[in-house]
UniProtKB/Swiss-Prot annotation:
This is Urease subunit gamma. PANTHER family: UREASE (PTHR33569:SF1). Pathway: Nitrogen metabolism; urea degradation; CO(2) and NH(3) from urea (urease route): step 1/1. It is found in: Cytoplasm. The keyword Translocase does not apply. Belongs to the urease gamma subunit family. It comes from Geobacillus kaustophilus (strain HTA426). Pfam families: Urease_gamma (PF00547). It catalyses: urea + 2 H2O + H(+) = hydrogencarbonate + 2 NH4(+). Its main location: cytoplasm. GO terms for biological process: urea catabolic process. GO terms for cellular component: cytoplasm. Keywords: Cytoplasm, Hydrolase. The gene is ureA.
Amino acid sequence: MKLTPREQEKLLIVVAADLARRRKERGLKLNYPEAVALITYELLEGARDGRTVAELMQYGATILTRDDVMEGVADMIDEIQVEATFPDGTKLVTVHQPIRS
């Protein structure tokens, strides 16, 4: 199977987000890459589901809480930017302070 670099990156996000979700369900706190992967995946899927950029910017800050991540991780993530595919094209979604509470 031949994948473009963009397709490889998306596949890596899916795998990392799946691992993060499983660890979170087991009660483990997520590290930096796991937290970023899970938020990124949810934003990408939200775009595919037809949500707007504004909706995703708000939703992105509700996916994880400080209790879901290891100490210091929330402070390390100032923003997450995702180039997502919407029904009307590709757009940049930026979530500032994605882990707020």
